[in-house]
Amino acid sequence: MSTSDFEERVVTVPLRDVSAVPTHERAGRAMTLIREHLAQHFRVDESDIRLDPSLNETVWARGSQNPPSKLRVRAARFDEDGESIVEAEPAE
């Protein structure tokens, strides 16, 4: 695997926009915002982004009504079968 086939970055995803959503939908909307933000920054389709379950647990840790206002995410892009895939997990 050459260096051009693998790229890893730590990205801060702003989640302030979830405050405009009804309270019972905020954590779900935050997950959608994370996926959209990573798709934009890695220039891939949203369906090519795989979110780690620990990222889901981090967003939902304070309940569905109070997700974090921003989140640091470690994302890695690699080529799989000629297609770019992005895997994301919370950065520590």
UniProtKB/Swiss-Prot annotation:
One of its GO terms (molecular function) is structural constituent of ribosome. Pfam families: Ribosomal_L31e. GO terms for biological process: cytoplasmic translation. Signal peptide: none annotated. SMART domains: Ribosomal_L31e. It comes from the Archaea. Keywords: Ribonucleoprotein, Ribosomal protein. GO terms for cellular component: cytosolic large ribosomal subunit. Belongs to the eukaryotic ribosomal protein eL31 family. This is Large ribosomal subunit protein eL31. It comes from Haloquadratum walsbyi (strain DSM 16790 / HBSQ001).
